[in-house]
Amino acid sequence: SDEPSEEHKADYLKAKAVVEPYLPGCILRDALSSYDYYTEGLVKHPVVATNHITPFIENDVPDLWAYTCCGQCVDVGNRFLAMPSNRNRILGVQMWKYHITGFLHWGYNFWNSQLSKAVIDPFQVTDAGGAFPGGDGFSVYPGENGPLPSLRQKVFAMALYDMRALSLAEEKLGRESVLKLLGDGESLSLIHI
C-alpha cells in the first residue's frame, strides 16, 4: 500500500486479503501515516513518513521503520538535491535515537516522468518532469557498467554508518552516555531539522 487513509480502509483490507495468503512467513510492511491503522491491527509493521512518526515513537512501536519521499520537504531530513547534506546525514543519528530499525526511500532509479509516461535523463531532468522535488525519484544515475552512486546516496551511507557507530558506542558506554555526548539529543527530533 501507499499511505492508506480512513477512506481506503475497506479497499486496503480487501487487497491485503488477496495478497497475504501468498506470502506465508513474510513480514508485510506498509507505508502509512495513520496511527489508527496500527492500533486497530490492520498493519503490524508500519513504515511511517518521518513527518508523521511521532505517535509511533511515543508509543514504542517495535521494529519501526521510517521513510521519506516528496512530502517530507519541510522541517525534516531528506535527500533532495536542493537540501544540504546535513539534512540527509542526520537521519542515521535520528534513527538510532528513536530505535528506528529500517528506512525506506522509494526512488532508487526511477528515471521516468510521473506515472512512467516517458523515460527521462536524470542528468538533465531531476524532478520526474516536474512531478517531484529534484532527486526524489532516484539515488543513482545510469552508467555504462551499472548504476553510478550519487553524492546523496554516499551521504546516506554515512548516515547509516553513524547509526551503527552509535549502536556500538551504546553497547560499550550505555545509552545515556551516548545521548549526553550528543548534547542529550534534544535537538535531534525527527522534525524541525
Predicted regions and their residues:
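Intervening/peripheral non-core polypeptide segments
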Residues: L42, I191-I193
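Catalytic-core regions of glycoside hydrolase
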Residues: S1-S116
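Catalytic domains of carbohydrate-active enzymes that cleave complex glycans
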Residues: S1-Y12, K16-S33, S116-I191
